[in-house]
Structure formats: structure tokens, C-alpha cells
């Protein structure tokens, strides 16, 4: 084991503490003091140090929230203290009866009794066990006595501390709480699913539960799960708490989030007022609650009251009325998302749901329509929860009229008229219009101008948004028609910046075929595939005229991608867009393909660290031009690794696997040799004499 320099060890400890503090400030205090970008920079620095010095990596490091190797199954966990359910109250009278029962049992005045009240989050209950301050086990509620060990998944949730904070750390503590998903995170998760053609979740609770039960914890790590603590079930060591609210205060000092809405109230009036007040706040929350939990605050009184069968006498759950109504589905229209995904939107007979008039609801995709069995004209059940878009959750088939009609996916985009496509295995249909489709215009232009595409310096996302909104730019070619005088009229874009942007646009006209193919945004055509297409066909015309069979013969191109490419070039408006770009002066050198050998064909190379003589992208392009595939990871099949300055874990892995490693000097020498040999062998033959 190599000796770690003291300065490195101290820096790692500092980063560890800074990241822990940032998590505490964000999730517990709700007072973030650094930006997301600053947090990410600290995390990347710690990851880099741990990659160079694996001994620094600890189970409670903030870097260990990315997930571990997939498990084969979840082990059963027997709860040391059963996770019991609560009795329910559905109105003020039942709340009053609960307070009276408690007061009678304790033989006291109900008006003087203190109750701790908090929202009942609609998620998944879990139990977390900490030994000497470190998380050792996390389990689901299960049937209340036996749950499942989901420790690896729970470790990925940033609002769950891997190591407890403070000086008074108990030898053992079991903390219970709810894993849930905010509406904002849920909508973003479903947006990504729609873009990728995956199934969407019906509601945040299902999303949270499904994420927590993934055998592959890296999936849970990518989901926006959160945790809120509500109970101390076991505690060993110093315990000076006299009330439930005392325990919740201690949980905050240990690093847990508790509900910011909890309150300690007195008597029947206080309990009823809290439930009414929370009910008024309910629709403005960024997460689902299905009620309130009312607990006798005194721990001594809790012990005296005890339990009846499956529930404690000292607590009750107040349930709010369901946020559902029935109405008529009048029609279905299809909206086009920023990457072309078609989403069916239900047009409803307006109905009041949870105090809000609902006239539209999402149907997600055609699979969901088929699952529901819904038809236009049906009486449907509509649910609304907080800020989540209202959705249809069922059909009242007993009220179905004879005049209903089926919902059909349009064959052409309702925005631009392009052909729609739905590939086998995908649940979403998409518009194939790409750059031509106004609904996709902003994102298509941002991709076109991005660093790995045409790399237009100074053309940021906000500026593109503004140019599209003012209708100054409708196609990529319009970018190259912009004039400095007009650009200078825009807010925060002075004359000098406007001139710089026009110069950058002029420079971007000179590109490569591979970059251009990538820039035009053919679905699923990334950098590597674009480079393969450029090498294989040599010109845009040859690529645009290629058959499906010819496309499938290209390295990295399978039947699905071939179909995307083929469809793109068969759309007349896409051809017009390409001709327009060439008309404003976008050019590239055509790639020589006839007779040009590729000395690195079939080889995979990896670039790591910083190169002084060129950028990594330039090095990658030169390797690809010689036939190599350039990968971002090292394996036994890697032919060689080019190691620049500050090469990290890829260098170490290559050395461990016995993969050849060369420095930049050797790389330049080999490039010169390979490119010279390729050029000499590729000399064109002299034309035959003509009579």
C-alpha cells in the first residue's frame, strides 16, 4: 500500500466534511450555501483523490452514493421493534373522539394534553439502523414484522446520512421515516422516460417504491428519491428525551431531515386546527401527503397508553378526502415534446378536483391508453395531487355510451406534418421532423451549436431561446444570416459581443463531415456513429442516398439506428434544411474512402489525462480516421491507452490489466507513422489515357 501524502489526506477529509455539511444545509436546514455546480466540483475532486488513492475511500464517503453491483435478491429483515400501522380518523368528530379516549385513559384534562402533529407523507416507510454513527442496515416495512434489506439503495439517497453528525453519537439508533419523491423530481423522471421511449410511472409513490426495490442500486441512485425521518424506534446510550418532539429535534442534530410542517399543539381544538391548516396547504406542497399523523407527545404517556393489537393507542392518522372526480373524456390531442415525443392529452368536461378546475389530463402514451382501455366519450376517473399534472386513472365502464370511439396515434406530426414513428420495444411515438419541427426547434439548435457539433463559441442556450422566441432564427441556416448590428439590439449583448458571435459563426462554417452529421441531430446518432458514417460513405450525398442494407453494414449501426438515418434523409424538409446550410456556406472536406487503409481498424483505444499538443477531441478524431474505435473505459479488449498529464483511474486499470500504455510523445510518433503509411498507401491511381 503506497503512503498517502498528509496534504492529500487532509484535503480528502476537508472535502468529505464540506460535502457532508452541504447535504445537511440543503436537506435538513433547507438553507443551501453553495450552488449545485460548486457541490459537483467538490464531489469530482474527492472522486479524483479516491481514484488515485483507493485507501481514502470509506463506506460513508459522499462519493459512495452512486450504487453498487446488482444484487440477486433482497434478504429478509426481521424488525427488532415491529413497524405497526395506525388507526384512521376521517373527520373532526373522529379526531375529537381520539383525544377524548386518550384523555380518559390517562385520567387527565384533554385540553392540556400535548400532541405532536406532522404530515403523513405518501411514500414508502423504511427503518435505518446506525451503529456507532454509521449506517449499517436499511429495510422496508414489509408486513410490519418482516421487511426487505434495501441498504444499498438507501445509501444512494443524499438526504440519508451515511455517517451521523455531532459529538453525542449513540452506540445504536434505529430511525424510521418515509422515502418519497417530489413532484418536480417525478415530472423530470417521467420526462426522461418519455424521451427515451420508456414506460412512465403513474404517480410519485409508485416511482419511489419501484426505485427502492431495484436490485441494481445504480438505478435507485439515478432517481430523485428523498427521505424524511419521523420516529426513533430504538436508542442505546444517553437518552434524555421526554417527548416525541424531543426525539425529532435530536434527529435534526444527527443529520436527518424532519418535516418543516410539524407542530406541537394542545387538546382537541389544536389537533383539529392543525389538520384543517395542513389541508389548506396540501395542494401547494411539492410532494404528496395523504393525511396527518397525530401523536401524544409525552413518551411517558405513550408508554402508559400502550398498544391494541396492530396499532398504538397514542397515535392516529387523519385521512383527507380523495382527490378524484369523474367526468367525460371529450377528445384527445397530441402534444409534441422538445425531442419529438408525442404525448396524448385528454380534453375533459371541466370538473372541480381538490378545489381546482381540471379540463386537461395526461394519458402518457399509447400503452397507458391500452392499459386503461379508455375511449373518447368515456366517463373517466381523474386524479389530481398537488402540482402533479392531473391524470386519468380509470374508466367507469358501466357508464360507457355506444358512441365512444378509439384513440388513434396520428401518422403525421400535428405540428409540422412529418411522419411519426414508433419502434418495436418503445412505448412512445416520435415526430421524425427533427430540425424542421417548430416544437423541437430550440433543443435542435442548441445541439447544432454545441461544442461537439459545430462548436459555435458564444452561442449559449439562453441566447438561442431568445433568438427563437423573437423568430429571428427558425432553421440552423438562419444562424449564419445573423448580423452584428441586429444582434447588438439584444439585452446583455453589446456591440463587441455581437461582432465576436458573428465571427464565431463564420468560423463554424468550416467543419468536418463527422461533426456535421452529428450536428444535424439524427436520432441516436452520436459522435462515434457520426464518425463511422463519415468514414464509410465519405460524403453527405452518399450517406443521404444509402439504402437500409448499406446503412446496416456500417460499424456501430444496427437496424434501429439505420431506420432513423434512412427516415431522416427521406423527409423533403430535412433535405431542404441541409441544402440551405450548404447554401449559406457551411463546408467540410470530403473523406477519402477509396483505397485508404485503416491501420487501426478493429482496435479500441482510450485517451486519458491532458494532452499538450492537441485536445482530447482532436486525438480522438485522428484515431478514428485511422479506423480505431475510441472508448471512455478500459477493458481487456483495449488495444492501447494514451496517457497524458494527470491521468487517473484509467491508467491504473490499464496497468492492472496489462494493456499497453503510451505517453504523448510516443503517441505523436505513432500517429505520424500511421498517418504517413495510410497516406502513401492511399495514393490515387493515374487515370487511363483517353483516346
Curated annotation (Swiss-Prot):
The processes (GO biological process) annotated in the record are: DNA repair; DNA replication
Q: Which residues form the active site?
A: 120
The stretch of residues making up the signal peptide is none
Q: Looking at the keywords, is DNA damage present?
A: yes
Provide any one GO MF term from the record. DNA ligase (NAD+) activity
Show where the BRCT domain sits: 595-684
- The keyword Zinc belongs to this UniProt entry's keyword annotation: yes
Which co-factors does it depend on? Mg(2+); Mn(2+)
Q: Which PANTHER family match?
A: CHROMOSOME TRANSMISSION FIDELITY FACTOR 18 (PTHR23389), DNA LIGASE (PTHR23389:SF9)
Q: What is this protein called?
A: DNA ligase
Amino acid at each position: 500500500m503506497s503512503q498517502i501524502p498528509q496534504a492529500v489526506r487532509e484535503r480528502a477529509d476537508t472535502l468529505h466534511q464540506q460535502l457532508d455539511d452541504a447535504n445537511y444545509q440543503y436537506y435538513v436546514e433547507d438553507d443551501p450555501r453553495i450552488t449545485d455546480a460548486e457541490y459537483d466540483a467538490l464531489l469530482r475532486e474527492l472522486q479524483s483523490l479516491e481514484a488515485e488513492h483507493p485507501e481514502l475511500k470509506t463506506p460513508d464517503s459522499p462519493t459512495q452514493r452512486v450504487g453498487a453491483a446488482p444484487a440477486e435478491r433482497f434478504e429478509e429483515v426481521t424488525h427488532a421493534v415491529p413497524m405497526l400501522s395506525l388507526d384512521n380518523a376521517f373527520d373532526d368528530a373522529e379526531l375529537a373522539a381520539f383525544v377524548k379516549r386518550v384523555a380518559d385513559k390517562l385520567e387527565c384534562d384533554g385540553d392540556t394534553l400535548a400532541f405532536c402533529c406532522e404530515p403523513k407523507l405518501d411514500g414508502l416507510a423504511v427503518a435505518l439502523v446506525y451503529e456507532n454513527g454509521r449506517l449499517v442496515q436499511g429495510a422496508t416495512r414489509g408486513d410490519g414484522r418482516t421487511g426487505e434489506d434495501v441498504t444499498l439503495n438507501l445509501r444512494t439517497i443524499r438526504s440519508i446520512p451515511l455517517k451521523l453528525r455531532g459529538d453525542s453519537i449513540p452506540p445504536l439508533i434505529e430511525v424510521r421515516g418515509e422515502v418519497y419523491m417530489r413532484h418536480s423530481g417525478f415530472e423530470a423522471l417521467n420526462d426522461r422516460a418519455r424521451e427515451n421511449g420508456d414506460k412512465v410511472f403513474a404517480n410519485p409513490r409508485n416511482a419511489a417504491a419501484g426505485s427502492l426495490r431495484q436490485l441494481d442500486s445504480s438505478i435507485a441512485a439515478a432517481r430523485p428519491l428523498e427521505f424524511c425521518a419521523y420516529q426513533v424506534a430504538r436508542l442505546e446510550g444517553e437518552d434524555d428525551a421526554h417527548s416525541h418532539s424531543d426525539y425529532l429535534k435530536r434527529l435534526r442534530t444527527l443529520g436527518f431531515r424532519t418535516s418543516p410542517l410539524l407542530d406541537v399543539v394542545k387538546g382537541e381544538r389544536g389537533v383539529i386546527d392543525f389538520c384543517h391548516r395542513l389541508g389548506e396547504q396540501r395542494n401547494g406542497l411539492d410532494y404528496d401527503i395523504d393525511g396527518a399523523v397525530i401523536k401524544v407527545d409525552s413518551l411517558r404517556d405513550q408508554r402508559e397508553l400502550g398498544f391494541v393489537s396492530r396499532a398504538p393507542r397514542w397515535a392516529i392518522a387523519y385521512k383527507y378526502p380523495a382527490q378524484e372526480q369523474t367526468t367525460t373524456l371529450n377528445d384527445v390531442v397530441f402534444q409534441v415534446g422538445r425531442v419529438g415525443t408525442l404525448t396524448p392529452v385528454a380534453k375533459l368536461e371541466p370538473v372541480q378536483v381538490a378545489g381546482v378546475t381540471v379540463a386537461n389530463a395526461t394519458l402518457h402514451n399509447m400503452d397507458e391508453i391500452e392499459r386503461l382501455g379508455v375511449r373518447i366519450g368515456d366517463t373517466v376517473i381523474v386524479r389530481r395531487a398537488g402540482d402533479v399534472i392531473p391524470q386519468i386513472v380509470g374508466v367507469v365502464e358501466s357508464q360507457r355510451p355506444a358512441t365512444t370511439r378509439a384513440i388513434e396515434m396520428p401518422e403525421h406530426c400535428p405540428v409540422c406534418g412529418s411522419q411519426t414513428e414508433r419502434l418495436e420495444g418503445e412505448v412512445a411515438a416520435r415526430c421524425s421532423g427533427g430540425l424542421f419541427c417548430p416544437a423541437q426547434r430550440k433543443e435542435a439548435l442548441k445541439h447544432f451549436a454545441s461544442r461537439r457539433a459545430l462548436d459555435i463559441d458564444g452561442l449559449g442556450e439562453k441566447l438561442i431561446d431568445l433568438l427563437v422566441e423573437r423568430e429571428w432564427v427558425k432553421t440552423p441556416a438562419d444562424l449564419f444570416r445573423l448580423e452584428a448590428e441586429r444582434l447588438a439590439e439584444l439585452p446583455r449583448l453589446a456591440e463587441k459581443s455581437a461582432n465576436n458571435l458573428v465571427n464565431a459563426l463564420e468560423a463554424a462554417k468550416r467543419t468536418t463531415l463527422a461533426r456535421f452529421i452529428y450536428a444535424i441531430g439524427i436520432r441516436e446518432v452520436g459522435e462515434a456513429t457520426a464518425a463511422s458514417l463519415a468514414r464509410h460513405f465519405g460524403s453527405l450525398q452518399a450517406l443521404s442516398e444509402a439504402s437500409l442494407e448499406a446503412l446496416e453494414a456500417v460499424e456501430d449501426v444496427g437496424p434501429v439506428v439505420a431506420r432513423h438515418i434512412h427516415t431522416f434523409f427521406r423527409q423533403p424538409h430535412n433535405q431542404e434544411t441541409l441544402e440551405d446550410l450548404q447554401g449559406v456556406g457551411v463546408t467540410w472536406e470530403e473523406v477519402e474512402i477509396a483505397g485508404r487503409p485503416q491501420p487501426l481498424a478493429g482496435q479500441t483505444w482510450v485517451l486519458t489525462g491532458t494532452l499538450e499538443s492537441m485536445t482530447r477531441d482532436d486525438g480522438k478524431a485522428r484515431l478514428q480516421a485511422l479506423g480505431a474505435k475510441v472508448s471512455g473505459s478500459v477493458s481487456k479488449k483495449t488495444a492501447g491507452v494514451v496517457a497524458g498529464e494527470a491521468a487517473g483511474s484509467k491508467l491504473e486499470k490499464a496497468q492492472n490489466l496489462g494493456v499497453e500504455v503510451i505517453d504523448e510523445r510516443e503517441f505523436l510518433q505513432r500517429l505520424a507513422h500511421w498517418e504517413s503509411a495510410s497516406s502513401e498507401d492511399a495514393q490515387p491511381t493515374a487515370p487511363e489515357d483517353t483516346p
